[in-house]
């Protein structure tokens, strides 16, 4: 990605995050994301399919999209990693809270309330 493409991507509220299945097919999911030091961070339920797929295939791709997943930009090839270290997870959470503010804090509140906060997975995406 060049700097103009990066700027357009980072202005978006959502990206379509595509992970690869064993069959080679791609599964697209609209997600919140936050930039930090050249990487992008997302979160998901720990048992979600995208998390399981990333354990097998680090290849991924991202594109800007609407909240409902309708693509609004081009695909970019990336590599993604599930973050297992608490320090790395805190970096991801801080980046997401910085970008989404009260919305992320509200999501955190309900995740704690329902017991899902501890089962969250944080993912780093490297362009």
Language model features with spans:
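Short flexible/disordered coil segments
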Residues: 1-4, 28-34, 80-82, 126-127
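Short charge-dense sequence patches
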Residues: 1-7, 39-50
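Extreme N-terminal tail/first-helix region
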Residues: 1-16, 70
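Residues at structural and domain junctions
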Residues: 3, 10, 40, 78-82, ...
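Short helix-to-loop capping/linker segments positioned immediately adjacent to catalytic or ligand/cofactor-binding
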Residues: 4, 19-23, 107-113
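Short, structured beta-strand-loop surface elements
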Residues: 47-122, 126-127
């Amino acid at each position: 990605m060049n700097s103009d493409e990066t700027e357009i991507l980072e202005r978006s509220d959502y990206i379509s995050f595509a992970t690869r299945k064993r069959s080679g097919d791609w599964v697209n999911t609209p997600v919140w994301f936050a930039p930090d030091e050249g990487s992008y961070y997302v979160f998901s339920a720990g048992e979600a399919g995208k998390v399981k797929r990333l354990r097998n295939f680090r290849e991924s791709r991202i594109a800007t999209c609407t909240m409902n997943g309708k693509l609004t930009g081009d695909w970019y090839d990336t590599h993604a990693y599930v973050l297992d270290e608490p320090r790395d997870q805190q970096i991801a959470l801080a980046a997401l809270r910085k970008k989404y503010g009260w919305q992320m804090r509200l999501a955190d509140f309900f995740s704690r309330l329902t017991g899902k906060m501890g089962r969250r997975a944080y993912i780093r995406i490297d362009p």
